[in-house]
Amino acid sequence: MKAATASIDLNALEHNLNQIKSKAPHCKVMSVVKANGYGHGLLHIAKHSKSSDAFGVARIEEALQLRAGGIVKPILLLEGFYSSGDLPILVTNNIQTVVHCEEQLSALENAELETPVVVWLKVDSGMHRLGARPEQYQNFVERLHQCANVAKPLRYMSHFGCADELDRATTVEQTELFLSLTDGCEGERSLAASAGLLAWPDSHLDWVRPGIISYGVSPFADKSAQDLGFYPVMTLTSHLIAVRDVKAGESVGYGGNWTSERDTKVGVIAIGYGDGYPRTAPNGTPVFVNGRKVPIAGRVSMDMLTVDLGPDAADKVGDEATLWGKDLPSEEVAEHIGTIAYELVTKLTSRVAMEYVK
């Protein structure tokens, strides 16, 4: 019997990608697989994302892992290259890059490359994290057009800061600014990630860049992915390794921060923060056991957590417990913990067994 296992449902992944295509039927899809495929396994996800037209990553090491694994579709470095020494690697491995700052632009201008690199100019349309500011935009465009190391036509992208908040005007303002700057440009454009894809159709343009929604996790605080017609790709499970009688007034776990108000049965599950399950999960965080949700009772430890099974529980050692996934949305668990589901799925450690099912 294995302890913590992340089961990756490749049929769910295929369903989600089909859903994405249906919501942006005239767009190309750049599946974002950074952070080890959002914790789902970089190479496995890429190999089974057959309908994707390209892949987006954050680190050059991720791009090289994809190439080494046989992925031949276009790959884009979403943050661009970190040093001029990366540029020959991009050329050798046919990796596209974002350019978002003067340092990257200067490095391209001064490099001696065998062949030009496909470049996406990132525009700061209002998030103010990365990108050429509107007043810098024309200068960047002119220099990139003149640079022999840049493949033509130049491409254009930006990123939303608040697309998951549907009652804010920020996304409309960002879209309008980006469109006004890039209107009439020859190259392809990309603006929408997961929330933009789902909620802001005016942002779809030539390419969409779905990330978290591909994995069946919602980008919105008030809607689960299932509500939106997507299936969870990851289901995280473990097993009960003990079922103990706990009397009213007895405390459980480190610090004794949960005290039973009744005689009950407490289940011990073989997963903890050493597996990436958050230590900060408070009492009451749900776990799914034998067809019902039961609450965490006591502090999460490195290798175990404890749940209140109830006084009449018939659960036994070896029974499966689902931490999140098909029977328990990761969004619901994240809300209890005070985080986002993105963090849950990307923080699993190497101790968790990965199983791919179809």
From Swiss-Prot:
Entry binding sites for substrate: 129, 302
Record-level GO cellular component terms: cytosol
Cofactor list: pyridoxal 5'-phosphate
GO terms, biological process: D-alanine biosynthetic process
Active site per UniProt: 34, 254
Pathway connected to this protein: Amino-acid biosynthesis; D-alanine biosynthesis; D-alanine from L-alanine: step 1/1
Residue numbers bearing the N6-(pyridoxal phosphate)lysine modification: 34
Gene3D superfamilies according to UniProt: Alanine racemase, Lyase, Ornithine Decarboxylase, Chain A, domain 1
InterPro entries documented for this protein: Ala_racemase, Ala_racemase/Decarboxylase_C, Ala_racemase_C, Ala_racemase_N, Ala_racemase_pyridoxalP-BS, PLP-binding_barrel
Keyword Isomerase: yes
Pfam families, sorted: Ala_racemase_C, Ala_racemase_N
CDD domains listed in its UniProt record: PLPDE_III_AR_proteobact
EC main group: isomerase
Domain of life: Bacteria
EC number in record: 5.1.1.1
The entry's keywords: Isomerase, Pyridoxal phosphate
SMART domains: Ala_racemase_C (SM01005)
Molecular function terms from GO: alanine racemase activity; pyridoxal phosphate binding
Enzymatic reactions: L-alanine = D-alanine
Cross-referenced HAMAP family: Ala_racemase (MF_01201)
Physiological role: Catalyzes the interconversion of L-alanine and D-alanine. May also act on other amino acids.
Family, per entry: Belongs to the alanine racemase family.
Protein name, as recorded: Alanine racemase
Organism: Vibrio atlanticus (strain LGP32) (Vibrio splendidus (strain Mel32))
Gene this protein is translated from: alr
